[in-house]
Swiss-Prot record:
GO molecular function, one term: bitter taste receptor activity
Protein name: Taste receptor type 2 member 13
Gene for this chain: TAS2R13
UniProt source species: Gorilla gorilla gorilla (Western lowland gorilla)
Cytoplasmic-facing ranges: 29-55, 107-128, 206-232, 283-303
Membrane topology: Multi-pass membrane protein
Residues listed as glycosylation sites in the UniProt record: N162, N166
GO CC field: membrane; plasma membrane
Function recorded in the entry: Receptor that may play a role in the perception of bitterness and is gustducin-linked. May play a role in sensing the chemical composition of the gastrointestinal content. The activity of this receptor may stimulate alpha gustducin, mediate PLC-beta-2 activation and lead to the gating of TRPM5.
Keywords: G-protein coupled receptor, Glycoprotein, Membrane, Receptor, Sensory transduction, Taste, Transducer, Transmembrane, Transmembrane helix
A Pfam family hit: TAS2R
Keyword Membrane: yes
Chief place of localization: membrane
Length: 303
């Protein structure tokens, strides 16, 4: 049974790979069709396109890394191969996390209501704010790449002195853990920002509901519904990313103790985040949801 586990986990990852490519590809396709037909596209739709493309890249990177780790482990001690695999993961994961966080900030600035002059200033210039944040995240990306490159250089310097390349797997796993730790520390910033956006959206919704009660209005007014939908999208991102973060932590421990089964399980669960969260974005967006239901109805009718 234990020998069959790698094959089972591989099948699950392939299924997640297919779901992720279909859901993210659907987001890109529908928005691009709308862009061509209307000659314009809203800021949130542009964010969704870039986020979906980054997730497609991340899913492909995870799948390639998975198969290389199972069948061509020697590539990870090659200087060029090691840098390509790790840097591609860093870049795709960086844009995946930060674009989802920027989407949370966009919902906050567009939907929430606060009387603070600073908030109103940002709200009136939301498109410029989003662009500046996106450009500012490149600083984190470059710092992350520099730090990881130092880890890689130290690793290669140690083992280039060993002409036989008979390295210890425990040493390589220690190197892998240090790399994952660095990447995760850089990932905490977007998660924290998204969590703050979530709390501010809740506070704004609470104030809005209190105002509606004072005016003797129901809770199903349009603004309440918009608040609720935005909260669902942000909290789904937080929950999915929290599970992804826990899987990374567990994979660290499993690598240190050389527990292959736990490591593969954590990696498989971790892929669920970029693969499935985009499907929730489709359901939370009126245009994408309508297009999805239309396609699903046509597919069902042909059965």
């Amino acid at each position: 049974m234990k020998s069959a586990l790698p094959s089972i986990f591989t099948l699950v990852i392939i299924a997640e790979f297919i779901i992720g490519n279909l859901s993210n590809g659907f987001i890109v396709l529908i928005n691009c069709i709308d862009w061509v037909s209307k000659r314009e596209l809203s800021s949130v739709d542009k964010l969704l396109i870039i986020l979906a493309i980054s997730r497609i890249g991340l899913i492909w990177e995870i799948l390639v890394s998975w198969f290389l780790a199972l069948h061509y482990l020697a590539i990870f001690v090659s200087g060029t191969g090691l840098r390509i695999m790790i840097f591609s993961w860093i870049v795709s994961n960086h844009f995946n996390l930060w674009l989802a966080t920027i989407l949370s900030i966009f919902y906050l600035l567009k939907i929430a209501s606060f009387s603070s002059p600073a908030f109103l200033y940002l709200k009136w210039r939301v498109n410029k704010v989003i662009l500046l944040i996106l450009l500012g995240t490149l600083v984190f990306l470059f710092l992350n790449l520099i730090q990881i490159n130092m880890h890689i250089k130290d690793w290669l310097d140690r083992y280039e002195r060993n002409t036989t390349w008979n390295f210890s797997m425990s040493d390589f796993e220690t190197f892998s853990v240090s790399v994952k730790f660095t990447m995760t520390m850089f990932s905490l910033t977007p998660f924290t920002v998204a969590f703050i956006s979530f709390l501010l959206l809740i506070f704004s919704l609470q104030k809005h509901l209190q105002k509606m009660q004072l005016n003797y209005k129901g809770h199903r007014d349009p603004k309440t519904k918009v608040h609720t939908n935005a909260l669902k999208i942000v909290i789904s991102f937080l929950l999915f990313y929290a599970s992804f973060f826990l899987c990374v932590l567990x994979s660290w421990i499993s690598e240190l103790y050389q527990n292959t089964v736990i490591y593969m399980l954590c990696e498989t669960i971790g892929v669920f985040y970029p693969s499935s969260h985009s499907f929730l974005l489709i359901l939370g967006n009126a245009k994408l949801r309508q297009a999805f239901l239309l396609v699903a109805a046509k597919v069902w009718a042909k059965r």
